[in-house]
Amino acid sequence: MSEENPCPRNIFLLCKEYGLELEDLRLLCVWCKRPLSEADIWAFAIKELFVVWRKGFPFGACGKCLIAAGKLRQYRHWHYSCYGDTVETETGIPIPQLFMRCYICHKPLSWEEKEALLVGNKRFHNISGRWTGHCMNCGSSCTATDPASRTLH
């Protein structure tokens, strides 16, 4: 590891630092300690999540644990929910310029996803002091298998 950046913060920097291809990277989940599948590693990279370092070793997060962690954070740290115009008033920043993640899967929300929430008159949620919403995948009623497990919509 280089002296200026001893612990790469994302998957791409980790691969660059150690001269690995993404397909060759092997990580364990920081919570369940199981190996991440190739799909989990790609999802972790696409979601722009940070690598967690413990005792000098990098960890990622599997999809199941990310959803569980999101639910736990939602239950423990939900402050309030409101519509987009209120979020803009409170932050002083237009919704398109606010960095937001999906509170379920943690993917950064695209402008299209934020716009769908605004047009659909859906609420944004302040969880752990950060504004969140749901992405098109997690908010889609087509993919909901257990409506009782969905909250904050």
UniProtKB/Swiss-Prot annotation:
Main location: host cell
Cellular localisation: Host cytoplasm; Host nucleus
Zinc finger (unnamed) in chain: 29-65, 102-138
Pfam families: E6 (PF00518)
Family matches, as Gene3D superfamilies: E6 early regulatory protein
InterPro entries in the record: E6, E6_sf
Signal peptide: none
Highest rank taxon of the organism: Viruses
GO biological process, any: regulation of DNA-templated transcription
Keywords: Activator, DNA-binding, Early protein, Host cytoplasm, Host nucleus, Host-virus interaction, Inhibition of host innate immune response by virus, Metal-binding, Modulation of host cell apoptosis by virus, Transcription, Transcription regulation, Viral immunoevasion, Zinc, Zinc-finger
Transmembrane segments: none
UniProt GO MF annotations: DNA binding; zinc ion binding
Coiled-coil intervals: none
Cellular component aspect of the GO annotation: host cell cytoplasm; host cell nucleus
Function recorded in the entry: Plays a major role in the induction and maintenance of cellular transformation. E6 associates with host UBE3A/E6-AP ubiquitin-protein ligase and modulates its activity. Sequesters tumor suppressor TP53 in the host cytoplasm and modulates its activity by interacting with host EP300 that results in the reduction of TP53 acetylation and activation. In turn, apoptosis induced by DNA damage is inhibited. E6 also protects host keratinocytes from apoptosis by mediating the degradation of host BAK1. May also inhibit host immune response.
Family indicated by similarity: Belongs to the papillomaviridae E6 protein family.
Extra information: Belongs to the low risk human alphapapillomavirus family. The cancer-causing human papillomavirus E6 protein has a unique carboxy terminal PDZ domain containing substrate but low risk E6s do not possess this domain.
Assembly behavior: Forms homodimers. Interacts with ubiquitin-protein ligase UBE3A/E6-AP; this interaction stimulates UBE3A ubiquitin activity. Interacts with host TP53 and EP300; this interaction inhibits TP53 activity.
Protein's recorded name: Protein E6
Originating species: Human papillomavirus type 2a
